Amino acid sequence: MIVYEDEALVVLNKPAGLSSEGDLPARLRELWGAPDAYVGVIHRLDTGVSGLMVYAKTPAAAAELSRQVTQSQQAYAVLDGRAEPDGMAAPSPVFVKRYRAVIAGVPDEDLPAAGVLRDLLFKDSRKGRVFPVRRPRKGVREAVLEYRIAALSADQTRSLAEITLHTGRTHQIRVQFASRKHPLLGDGKYGSRVKGSIALQSCGLAFRHPVSGERMEFALDLPAELPWSAFSD
């Protein structure tokens, strides 16, 4: 589960089925044999999603990594045209999250082979779901992601998508693809008829070390099991 660890942070390969705010910090404290150890949550993954996450081991590291997350959100907003540059050239995002997903279908008019998806999303907390809407209103937030279709299954029924998040909305990737009639496999909440875990993996993570400033990059291989194995050749 642990990919990298030092005195300031720990990078994990989160298994599907564990919550990123409750289960994983508890597992870390158990591994360390330190029930009161500090574990700073920097970003989140849905419980049913697997892949890379970084946690801070000190409040100072948490503050710096959180600052990088905020900087990256602002940088993407400028790059996407959602915000004006602050008198200078738009900075490059520092904290970068990349994903891969297996989605139903192949590229079509609703979902070209590559592009940027922009939607207004409304989170209905009572129903535990997120819905795309057409107009801004209270509780609605803009969601933006960049993607490309990297491969098609041999039977031309599924696609492997590589995704870079520009915003970090609840269920964002799942909803944006499902709203274009390409739900993620295993995501019954948003329309998939395939049973199993949600076919979404946090496969890449990059940031600056909160103490040294060194650029750190982590990547995961394509999982060996279905449905990922359909794209392993």
Predicted regions and their residues:
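Residue-level recognition of short loop/turn positions
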Residues: 126-127, 167, 211-212
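Pseudouridine synthases involved in rRNA/tRNA modification
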Residues: 1-22, 85, 156-158, 170-233
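Short histidine-centered loop motifs in beta-beta connectors
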Residues: 161-164
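RNA pseudouridine synthases
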Residues: 1-127, 135-142, 151-153, 225-231
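Short Pro/Gly-enriched beta-strand edge/turn motifs at strand-loop
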Residues: 127-131, 142, 183-190
